[in-house]
A protein has these predicted regions:
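Glycan-recognition and catalytic cores of secretory/periplasmic carbohydrate-active enzymes
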Residues: 1-345
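Non-catalytic C-terminal accessory modules of carbohydrate-active enzymes
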Residues: 301-408
Length: 408
């Protein structure tokens, strides 16, 4: 992560005097140059602001892991630029455009999906703003100097997402290699996950999430593997090919929804689809996208996270004879498993940690202080829920800084 972030920050940002300064370009238009300077389809100088928000959100996470201020400062610069350009939007325009010229500020173009190069529309719309919302949210929590502008941009984008994509299922483009319009599963299902993680902002969150999930199955469900009684997910409307990352993303969100709502409608297929997705990755980690070549980001990036989230939502899927952290409410900077001890450090004292363990621990400490096994609320505590094999350890409301240690 450090290598990737450092390389991009040194070789992929717009000029600080540009109309959109200090923003990461999504593509290297001179393929072997090692310099990111534009958009794969719309050319040199073109940014994708949604990817800038996603990159900055990952930089905040990296800052929390390393405590290196460089990543936080870079994330703040990107957030400042995004916030300054955020507008109200409407049914045809998102609060920030999908493509924009970093130097002139002009909105970029959508091109014909028939590879003619013909400009078909302005690239003023996408619904891939979940990471940007979380960027503003996390920077606000870090008490950033531009707190007010982050909060305002967060609210504007959130209200637009509620008013338009959530109602119309017009999710729009994401991928760099598609010239024109396409509705993408990643935009829709990532927002469904955002809703599940921010239920207080969505009074009808169950209906909202179910609506998105059903749209994805209706529009992008793939039935090629029906003989195995599993439906997997196509990538997008312009490229109706099943993807391992897209399928595992869908499954993880469906399992999160089931865990929080009690509605088990999607569980059986979700688990089968996760199993299907494993067949695209070899024992040594090679990933092969269906009917295509090796796409590294699809197999080594978000794909892995989907399985981690799936196991957190449905712990029975986690290995029963091993010890694993399934969930942390705070970013984990370090974790070590050794013999009769698990030791982890987090950015802030976590409200909740969840482990799948092979056997019940004898004790838990946080910051050197013993934490009691208790069902009482309002105190630091741990609870053991036995399973058929091993069990689930939940540690709650840790209010002291320092390492958490689980021992046997």
């Amino acid at each position: 992560m450090i290598y990737q972030a450092d390389y991009y920050l040194e070789n992929g940002l717009s000029d600080r005097h540009a109309a959109w300064p200090d923003m990461p370009f999504p593509y290297n238009t001179v393929v072997h140059s090692g310099i990111y300077d534009g958009d794969m389809r719309d050319g040199k100088g073109i940014l994708q602001p949604d990817k800038s928000g996603s990159f900055a959100h990952e930089l905040v996470t990296l800052y929390k892991i390393t405590r290196n201020e460089r990543y936080l400062v870079s994330a703040q610069k990107i957030a400042d630029c995004l916030a300054s350009h955020t507008t109200r939007g409407d049914s045809l325009h998102s609060p920030l455009p999908f493509r924009v010229n970093a130097f002139t500020g002009e909105t970029g173009h959508l091109l014909s999906n028939n590879s003619t190069g013909e400009v078909t529309a302005s690239a003023g719309y996408t619904a891939n703003w979940s990471s940007t919302l979380m960027l503003f949210e996390e920077l606000a929590e870090l008490d950033s100097p531009h707190l007010a502008s982050y909060n305002q941009a967060f609210q504007v984008i959130l209200e637009w997402m509620k008013a338009y994509p959530l109602r119309s299922n017009r999710w729009g483009p994401f991928f760099e290699d598609i010239p024109g319009w396409s509705d993408t599963q990643i935009n829709a299902i990532t927002f469904a996950m955002f809703i599940l993680q921010h239920r207080d902002l969505f009074p009808h969150w169950e209906k909202d999430v179910k609506g998105i999930i059903d749209w994805a199955h209706r529009e992008l469900g793939n039935h090629e593997y029906g003989r195995y009684n599993v439906e997997v997910m196509n990538e997008q409307t312009v490229y109706r090919v099943p993807g391992n990352s897209h399928t595992s993303r869908q499954s993880s969100v469906e399992l999160m929804y089931a865990s929080l709502s009690g509605d088990t409608t999607y569980v059986t297929n979700a688990i089968r689809a996760l199993n299907w997705a494993t067949y695209t990755v070899d024992h040594d980690g090679k990933n092969r996208y269906i009917r295509d070549d090796i796409w590294l980001t699809d197999g080594y990036g978000d794909y892995v996270r989907h399985f981690l989230r799936a196991m957190a939502a449905c712990p029975v899927l986690a290995p029963a004879n091993e010890n694993h952290l399934l969930f942390s409410s705070s970013v984990v900077s370090q974790i070590r498993y050794s013999g009769n001890l698990i030791r982890l450090e987090t950015f802030t004292p976590p409200d909740e940690l969840v482990f799948r363990l092979s056997r019940k621990p004898s004790g838990v400490k946080a910051g050197g202080m013993e934490i009691p096994e208790s069902l009482s609320s309002g105190i630091s505590r741990w609870v053991w829920d036995p399973m058929e094999r091993g069990g689930l350890l939940t540690i709650s409301d840790i209010n002291v800084k320092g390492a958490v240690m689980i021992r046997w």
